[in-house]
């Protein structure tokens, strides 16, 4: 009888663990299907320039009808501070350098294209940008 009791207790604990892990996945780790669809649209409709760009523009979340997208630049992270991560040959170049200017224009062009693709999707009325701090840190760029 004691053996059956221990076995039942182990099964109960195992079921609780499985349910807890399932809840963590369902409520915290899985990607929102709408966000996944928006990112799939970017992937499918992107020009070769956007598809092959050094930074993966993507939707992070959907707040009602507002798509929040990741970006490597913002007023807090101007282009001159992060351009070297995208184009290592431009690290330390002056912002008026012709190659720097061309790279800045290319960044703006592909970012705008990603935004336009997302805005074309049903249920999205606006795009807001959020600085991709994890990407910047992973590329050795200080946030302060």
Predicted segments with their positions:
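Short, low-complexity, Pro/Ser/Thr/Gly-rich segments in the mature regions of secreted, periplasmic
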Residues: 132-144
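Conserved aromatic-histidine-acidic binding/catalytic patches
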Residues: 30, 34, 102
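Extracytoplasmic/periplasmic/luminal assembly and interaction segments
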Residues: 44-117
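Short, Lys/Arg-rich N-terminal segment immediately upstream of the first membrane anchor
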Residues: 1-8
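Hydrophobic membrane-insertion alpha-helices, especially the h-region
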Residues: 9-28
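Short acidic amphipathic segments
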Residues: 56, 114-133
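Alpha-helical transmembrane signal-anchor/signal-peptide segments
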Residues: 33-47
């Amino acid at each position: 009888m004691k053996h059956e009791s221990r076995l039942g207790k182990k099964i109960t604990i195992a079921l609780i663990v499985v349910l807890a892990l399932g809840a963590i996945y369902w409520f915290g780790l899985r990607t929102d299907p709408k966000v996944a669809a928006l990112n799939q649209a970017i992937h499918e409709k992107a020009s070769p320039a956007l598809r092959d760009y050094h930074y993966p523009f993507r939707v992070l979340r959907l707040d009602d009808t507002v798509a929040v997208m990741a970006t490597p630049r913002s007023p807090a992270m101007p282009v001159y501070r992060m351009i070297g991560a995208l184009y290592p040959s431009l690290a330390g170049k002056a912002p008026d350098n012709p190659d720097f200017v061309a790279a800045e224009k290319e960044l703006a062009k592909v970012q705008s294209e990603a935004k336009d693709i997302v805005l074309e999707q049903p249920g999205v009325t606006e795009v807001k940008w959020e600085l991709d701090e994890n990407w910047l840190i992973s590329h050795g760029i200080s946030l302060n």
